[in-house]
Amino acid sequence: MLDTRELPLLRALAGRYPTTEAALSEIGHLRAILSLPKGTVHVVSDVHGEHRKLKHIINNASGSLRPLVERVFGDRLTAAEERALLSAVYYPRERYARVASHSEGARWAFLIWTLAREVEVIRALSLRYTLRQVEAAFPEDMRGLLRELVSARATLGEGGYLDALLDPFVQHGREIEILRATARAIRNLTVFELVVAGDLGDRGPRLDKVIEYLMRQPRVRVVWGNHDVSWMGASLGQEALIATVVRLSLRYGRLSQLEEGFGISVAPLDRLARTAYADDPAERFAVRGEGLRDALLMARMQKAAAVLQFKLEGQLCRRRPEYALEHRCLLHRIDARAGTVAIDGEVFPLLDARFPTLDPGDPYALTPDEAACVALLKESFLRSPALSRQMRWMVQQGTTWLRRDRALIFHGCVPVDGEGELLPFVVDGEVRRGRALFDALERTVRRAFRAGAQEDVDMLWYLWTGPLSPMFGKDRMTTFESYFVADERTHRETKNPYFHLIHDAAFCGRVCREFGVDEERGLIVNGHVPVRVERGESPIKASRRAVTIDGAFSEAYGDKGYTLVLEASGARLAQHHHFTSVEQAVEAGEDIIPVISDVEVYEAERRVGDTEKGEEIEREIELLERLIEAYRDGALLEQPR
């Protein structure tokens, strides 16, 4: 019996499917999708601003395009031809530039040779998709042309119909657009979805270019990490986070992402460094990288930003006592005359006791010059259209956790105690644990961008550094100690017990159950904590139910990285190595050929119907069945066109 309360929803659905036949056709299409092998999902993490390496890994589908080409062509291509074809798929513009100055005949020969082989690859990939899905993978402006190329039985280069389709592009010097479209179609069909498990920026050169390239991909989801929420909070004007991201940009010599990428001027900090820190050697603040500014000036700017960060964090901790982070405010524990600081009841000598802007009576107060600097930086962050656009995309495409078939993906940890019991944290006045905590924090982040309440914006700072933040998961962030104290005991950041417990299969099963993932076969996927392979660590934990894919992607931390490949046949881990340059990839055919290891091989191929996407499709089918019932009962009238 049709529930009349459903009618508004069904009436809206009727706009898309105005007849019974239209609804039945869509049901058939959806049921066909359920029977297909599930799409390949690639999961990467902790990119940390390495835009060139990320672009290559996306372009070569984490190394899976090379074996695909080998399977399609067998021994029909020489090694040189295979490299030429792959470079045209990875970098069509740069590859074509090598022949752009040649004669029209040579350009035509290159176009036909490349297109014929790319079309063959597309046809092979199309076998795993419906026709509608294949066409959706084609760039919209070129959809009709690619449809003809892929479906035609004629051969390119033999004259006639297909060559006539291409001829106008050659005449107008636009053949590169065809090559770009086919290359993109291959990449889109090879990887159904890209998931980035957090920490897109900091350390590496350009966060802005990382996000810009991700924004151009067809299907991307982001699981927020603590470095992501720091930039998100800074874009909303959270002052402690503004100081933090500026300090980190200076620490790694990455001012170009601020100044060129986001149009944010650091001139106010430059002025503060030249005045308040004019004679400061700032030896503890040497820049890890190169920049256009004088190295000593950048060190002084970094110190000025660090002191601003510590002051603003102290103000925030006093404003938000519920965070229970008062013990991490250390400026009032400095004895400037003795050159010491008290930490956890023990006194340590300071490596640098020059604090020209510190008032012993009110150490967290900003001087007038500091207040002016913060105000100008804040205005610059709030007025950056590029930063706002990219951070709002991060909110739109982002989440605190994600399920993909049997994989449970989140950046850091589920906060637990030593026994593996879920730890409580109060959000919106209610105690939350486990999945409820993740979901409540996600609502807070979205509300911060929607309404901008200071309480919500401040929560992004806690997510960056708080012990019960699922994105951080350590007892403390020892930034002050690493700058100012030699004793390495004070530098220690103790990880949440979660990171040890994921070696236990039973614990992993409980975590999966908490998030509605298969308790017996679920796989936990994290980033955040770099895998130190040189120390004998493995990304695949002893439980074989958890994998950490922070492989030190950035040059500053190892220049490796992992992609977890979730295929219909199983889960595999691809370990990447150093990427030299686009020029080497095009000129010499250099590639990142990953080392592949199996995480799990499935007994039977996983279908779309076995996954969470299948559950969504089943709900769509149920709604369409209700629409057909409404047409049959006369509750809604069909509207044949």
Curated annotation (Swiss-Prot):
Known cofactor(s): Mn(2+)
Alphabetical keyword list: Carbohydrate metabolism, Hydrolase, Manganese
SUPFAM superfamilies per the UniProt record, alphabetical: Metallo-dependent phosphatases
InterPro entries: FBPtase_class3, Metallo-depent_PP-like
UniProt enzyme class: hydrolase
Record's signal peptide: none
Protein name according to UniProt: Fructose-1,6-bisphosphatase class 3
Homology family: Belongs to the FBPase class 3 family.
GO process annotations (BP): gluconeogenesis
Catalysed reactions listed for this entry: beta-D-fructose 1,6-bisphosphate + H2O = beta-D-fructose 6-phosphate + phosphate
Enzyme Commission number: 3.1.3.11
Pathway assigned to this chain's UniProt record: Carbohydrate biosynthesis; gluconeogenesis
Stored Pfam families: FBPase_2 (PF06874)
Domain of life where this protein originates: Bacteria
A GO molecular-function descriptor: fructose 1,6-bisphosphate 1-phosphatase activity
Manganese found in the keyword field: yes
